[in-house]
Amino acid sequence: MESSSVASASSEAGSSRSLEIEELERFIDSYVLEYQVQGLLTDKTEGDGESDKTQSNVSQWTVECTERLEENRTSPRNREPTYSQNGNKEGPLDMLGTDIWAASTVESISGATWDLQPEKLDFTQLQLRQRNSPKHPPPQIDRDGFGKGKRVEGDDINLNDIEKVLPTWQGYSPLPHEADIAQTKKLFRRKRNDRRKQQKPQGGNKQPPSQQNDHQPATAKHNSREHQRQYHGNPPPPHPSGKQGHHGYSQNRRWHHNQKHLPNDLQRNAKETDTLKIEDASVCTVHIPLDIHSNTDSTERHCPPANDSEAKRKESIQSRDRPKISLLQSSKDRLRRRLKEKEDVAVESTNPQKTKMDKLIEILNSMRNNSSDVDYKLTTFMAEAQNSANSEEMLGEIVKTIYQKAVTDRSFAHTAAKLCDRMALFMVEGTKFRSLLLNMLQKDFSIREEMHRSDVERWLGFITFLCEVFGTMRSNMAEPFRVLVCPIYTCLRELLQSEDVKEDAVLCCSMELQSAGRLLEDQLPEMMSELLATARDKMLCPSESMLTRSLLLEVIELHANSWNPLTPTITQYYNKTIQKLTG
């Protein structure tokens, strides 16, 4: 009886083992057949002679990706470590010897060996390594809404309370010293009214010029000449009694609730400027343009009514209490284009007497994303470049010109990516345009940390152009360059972790995710999950600015909508919020 059970157990084990062997053989056959169809297996055997040199010069990008793969295999995610077919777990990531980031740099121009066909690379096994914990970690958020143990009342986050997630615009709590300011203004008004009542019986309906300068514009007794004298900073006539103003204040230092002095008034002294600076900002926020000439009369200006000025005063106090956000000029330009504001750009005409390279530069400078004839200019540039590129050096200069223009002017990045996509297969003496461009991107990616410290504008421009190239350019098989996926995720994560230009970096990350987020998630969804987790932690951190939280909330909501465009109402809400925060 025991022998029969042992025999049946051994037969079952043998049958299961034979099934596993057959399944492994089918997997190996399909693996070999796949690479035979793609033509990569033969290319690998032909390039075995050069594989030693390639592996000895592994680039920084390959090392980083290998480290990420190893750390993710050991990360606590309840995943079993995946082994390759030969059992070797620590082999190099570039199994086919076609690592585009391990190619030579731009300075050593060579032949067609630079075009290593990055569209055939497979990064499906690539994982992201764990993020380094920051010095001051954000508050731990239970994203599921429930703890693993006993739930404590008040620990969860109620997203229905939108005031905790995104600031509203219903006003701010009064400052501690606001009551003192209001009381001081009240005293000044009372003293001023008492002084006017005392002076009315003496002068009747005729008032001295000094009182006319202090009177409100609503009395309709001002003329344009008196307004001109007051706004140009001419000192008022002395008091009839020969005394100074009330409590030692001059006539110009009184609280004027319906008038605004010019910012370029040079006649006032430093004390008067300091005294009126806060009052002018809080009383009247209407700016009236003036043309000041020596022989011309200024037109009569009227301030808004008292109720309008009071509303303006409250709004100005709220804007003064709000932390000021300063953005780079390039970030302001990108926001302006997002909010669909018109941009007037002067375009110079082409001079036929200039050199060929100067003509190409002029065509590049005349291109804009919002111009109607951008396609025509792209075609003109391509024709001019083909006529000019008669050597490898000239082709390298053309690529360098386009690249420098794209990384220094972020508004040109999308147009430059379209131009590079059209000229990708352009070849001179065995050197492709695409290979030179990818090598330039690789070089700047390797020095991105130094670039971040020395030139923030160029750092942001490089990341923008890198994302635009990934979202626009396609390979011969109409697929995106998967070799750029991991560098882009690295750059986007560094944008969220930046501390010196927080708002500019978050704005850049938000806009690139809105344009290329779907494509990035299709290539490596796990890295997108890690990036969005960082974005959520940063959005819920109370130390972040309102602009940062608004931009990140928009990205998270866009991802929840499967990267489809949001409804016009929601889009208009975010646009108005950004206008208020950056205006």
UniProtKB/Swiss-Prot annotation:
The keyword Cytoplasm applies. It is found in: Cytoplasm, Perinuclear region. Residues 42-95, 129-154, 190-251, 294-325 are annotated as: Disordered. It comes from the Eukaryota. Residues 190-199 have a biased composition (Basic residues). GO terms for biological process: nuclear-transcribed mRNA catabolic process, nonsense-mediated decay; regulation of translational initiation. Specifically required for the pioneer round of mRNA translation mediated by the cap-binding complex (CBC), that takes place during or right after mRNA export via the nuclear pore complex (NPC). In contrast, it is not involved in steady state translation, that takes place when the CBC complex is replaced by cytoplasmic cap-binding protein eIF4E. Also required for nonsense-mediated mRNA decay (NMD), the pioneer round of mRNA translation mediated by the cap-binding complex playing a central role in nonsense-mediated mRNA decay (NMD). This is CBP80/20-dependent translation initiation factor. The gene is ctif.
